[in-house]
Amino acid sequence: MSMYGRDPWGGPLEICHDSATDDDRSRNLDLDRGALSRTLDETQQSWLLAGPGDQGRKKKKYVDLGCLVVSRKLFVWTVGVLLAAAVFAGLVAGIAKAIPRHHRPPPPPDDFTVALRKALMFFNAQKSGKLPKNNNVHWRGNSCMKDGLSDPAVGRSLVGGYYDAGDAVKFNFPAAFSMTLLSWSVIEYSAKYEAVGELGHIRDTIKWGADYFLKTFNSTADTIDRVVMQVGSGATSPGSTQPNDHYCWMRPEDIDYPRPVVECHACSDLAAEMAASLAAASIVFKDNKAYSQKLVHGATTLFKFARQNRGRYSAGGSDAAKFYNSTSYWDEFVWGGSWMYLATGNSSYLQLATHPKLAKHAGAYWGGPDYGVFSWDNKLTGAQVLLSRLRLFLSPGYPYEEILRTFHNQTSIIMCSYLPIFKSFNRTKGGLIQLNHGRPQPLQYVVNAAFLASLYGDYLEAADTPGWYCGPHFYPIETLRNFARTQIEYILGKNPLKMSYVVGYGNRYPKRVHHRGASIPKNGVHYGCKGGWKWRETKKPNPNIIVGAMVAGPDRHDGFKDVRKNYNYTEATLAGNAGLVAALVALSGEGHGVDKNTMFSAVPPMFPSPPPPPAPWKP
């Protein structure tokens, strides 16, 4: 199959060529036009045969315009009228320019753009370490400036990164997924980010995460034997009074208890996700060659470690198993391998990501109730959409075509499962899809599905494909966008409670977010480990508004409890907000669509290898 494939809707894609050759054009230019014999018409004969007197008389009465002969008087009158009209038009134009104008103001931003700007602010509120001057969250300050250094087993700086949610733990697994998702959205929709003035903001957000990840392993080495998976502790055993990030309720700026560092030596899922994060970021920062190459090197080292040291990062019984348990690492191999290929152009990564046995281990053929649910734990659906992009736009052909076609077909089926007509997932009476089957904290899964649906619709449009099939039924692209739009509109307030689940958006939103920094006033008072409990227990609204935070969401009956202690309703997370940002930018504005080429900036042309030269001829 060729690099570009065939037009799926019929007709060749070849550009028509001019039938005349360069030699033909050259010979035509060499011809002496004056030497050609031809018959003169009657008008030309009259010019040659008429005497001097005859020509003089005709010039006085008529003007020859080539295609016709007109009266000289009529010609002069017509020219005069045209000149007068031109002068008049010039005067009118000059007067119009001199009159002051009232320019029509640009249209107000749409709801999705307004929400996008707010959702990005959440990441500013979650930053750890020494904050930049333009952080713009007045109630936040420098925090946890001794991370890593205070742990004698580590002895190096792990300052920076992001707090995961309402506590002060830094979990690398969901944080890396969050940064991968943000980078993906920038690669696809950089024009939209730039149009609303947020491109620099989100690039800074991604770089803050990438710079921290580079600290969590030996990023200058080619081979490593460990990766930091967590800073801080959230585990509390019954009756324990040991100060940590869950027992205590303190502003991050006031933390004075030990913050342990947890490393892993066999964690394929974590390392492959971190590799995906750095690889995707390297495409975002391809305009900074040195930094991009630094990210690629780190990603390469991590992915090598992931393959050589098999295991789940949460298998050791750490905090991760309680808060962010990883069920498998095979999906991260497909996901990470895809991003490594796109960042490097090295076909060995694509061969791995499209290996049939790897797809089988990742659950590509299993189905089941969670099939098609994209999250920090399961990246298979994201990888399927990403590799469908490769097939739609580059069509690499053999030996990748078979598995790419399978992933493409599975992506179509997943998109069908999101539609209410097929009832693959339940919905609340208010219309919210239940991708986690009625369990708590549903919104993080909803925003991811909305992003993928909108993105896949844009892929189809960019490939000049008007829709896709669900069995025998054809659905237009707008069906995908309608699904994504209605789900995000529910989150922004179009729900039975008329409540926005994004803090700071709309007139009614959660006021008691499960968040230490937002719930404790910045009043110059140092509230210790237990001293902050009163702010956790109070029923008063948070003194600080954590703008842009998407809370966990309603229950399966569209109900919501704005209670600080109930994190199943009121806690916001990095992964949830990353999906929200991606979905909002995909739906925002008009036009633009996806950037087809930036994603493939490191991918070499996929022309087939030329055949070997023939052996020398011998008689």
From Swiss-Prot:
Function in brief: Involved in cell wall assembly during cell elongation.
Which organism does this sequence originate in?
Answer: Oryza sativa subsp. japonica (Rice)
Positions in the Extracellular compartment:
96-619
Gene field: GLU1
Q: Which residues form the active site?
A: D167, H514, D562, E571
Q: Which residues are glycosylated?
A: N218, N325, N346, N409, N426, N568
Those parts of the protein on the Cytoplasmic side are 1-74
UniProt GO BP:
cell wall organization; cellulose catabolic process
Inducing or repressing factors: By gibberellin (GA3) and brassinosteroid.
What is the protein name for this chain? Endoglucanase 9
